[in-house]
């Protein structure tokens, strides 16, 4: 089913091999259920409410089977099997919590804790750490290792990203989300064995967007946020859901608040059109709320000077001035903002129409929306949704650097190509990240991009439908030409 949240690797596996209609019957912990042929055991279990623990497995990304926490017992198989790579089969009987499985997970945790520091009381991840939860659940309260722990010094990769190699369990989530999800490839693995650790591709520092996805996806406290470090514990904060206003995507974000101060932002419940995704602006761009330059109280002009006053006095003054203008038959113009929510703009236009009696309402916009709406008049073309980007067979990106102007759309488009093999075509002024996987990429300056489309007509005509994403550089008559094309 279409969803803005990335679908699992098991769904991609089924889709590519044409197994979507084939169902098999399996039994998991005594519960009989059906699943699409090719579905991974870990996903089939989740659908019936059975959670198989895993550190390296993450829905939507390539499989690793590195942590061995997802081992399950399968009838007629002599050894335990990793549930994150094992596809279901007809008649399969799976035990996810048998004594044999429990002992294996306890042993795995003992290995993971061999060099892991026991610094939960001072670790930022304490209270929401997946490793901590698993140790409480399965034990491993004692260690048979008497050797000195191998320890590596914490590294600051950037102002926002810190890495502690001693805490890292090498699940490779951060590498995969940066490479596969974002197409940046800023992280890699160096050394081997006990000396192995995650390393920036450019040596000792990150060269990326600093979106913080690697921090959020880390199951332990190996990657921490420079803006949140040592400020609070998860249980000490209240959480409020809101909508990011830095671009028109409208991503859901959850603000963590303590004593009236925003300490961090993420999308902890993975709701909204963006699922778990947030770009750098959505994750870290909230500091303006607490800026010292922000007005804390209304200002009114008295004797030529702006002075602080109360809300009551300020609103009374504004109401009186508005009334005087209306009595003189004056006209009003109201300017809204693209950085406020739909609800706030709704009340602004309601105030303008009912309170001021004017329909002169506008806002600043960078794109040529008026030309676009005029070009669509009487046409059959439909406006695409974010979900369409994940399901479309083909997409055209023209006149925009998608990863910078609309990061969520770039994220979804890349996921579609990774999971479904969709075709992407790009016509831009300079190199863009979509070039990495695009079927064809063309370079064209502003005003020349529509003409350059003729070179893609043959490729695009092969697809029954195409989702088109165009940027600010396509304006005026070019918008109408694009719709007609």
Region roles according to the model:
Residues 31-39:
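Short, contiguous acidic and Ser/Thr-rich linear segments
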Residues 113, 117, 229-485:
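Catalytic alpha/large subunits of respiratory electron-transfer oxidoreductases
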Residues 21-29:
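Eukaryote-biased recognition of intrinsically disordered, low-complexity regulatory segments
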